[in-house]
Amino acid sequence: LGRTVEKLEAVYDAIEAAGGAQPAIFPMDLASAPESDYAGLAGAVGETFGRLDGLLHNASVLGERRPIENTTWKAWEQVMQVNVNAAFLLTRAMLPLLQAAPRASLLFTSSGVGRKGRAYWGAYAVSKFATEGLMQVLADELENTSEVRVNSLNPGATNTAMRRAAYP
């Protein structure tokens, strides 16, 4: 949807114009948000909506495309924070709200390099393998204990700024 409040507001307006339910905007920087922000977000969503019908993990950063031996810790950590840790923290915080909804859906965005590693995709590929693992573990844990569906989706090549950066 976008990494700016301006883009979120455009989506908000489109939902309203289409006659959808009253939306809400809860900006959060996944690269730096402390754990407590995720609990705060869940509390705000719970107060506003009472439940959560779906959660799409689509936020992701590419990081540096280079050999792992040349990847800096800072670059590695940033990719893992946004692509893996934020998904874990947000999922954990939102699970009670998802479980309060009938047939809620939890969807992770994957990548081909998260299913078969490729040279020079380093931290991004590893983060997508971790995303697949998180999805599989959650799907198994919730299979017979919850109505929450857990899946991942590999959308294939999409025309995004991240893809243009990967393939200049």
Give the positions of each predicted feature:
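Active-site loop-to-helix junction immediately N-terminal to the catalytic Tyr of the SDR YXXXK motif
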Residues: 71, 117-125, 137, 166
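Substrate-binding pocket helix/loop in short-chain dehydrogenase/reductase
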Residues: 41, 66-68, 75-77
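Active-site-adjacent segment of SDR/Rossmann-fold oxidoreductases
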Residues: 116, 137-148
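Rossmann-fold cofactor-recognition segment
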Residues: 18-34
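Active-site helix of classical SDR
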Residues: 91, 127
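Conserved NAD(P)H cofactor-binding loop of Rossmann-fold oxidoreductase domains
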Residues: 58-64
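Residue(s) in the substrate-gating loop at a strand-loop-helix junction
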Residues: 111
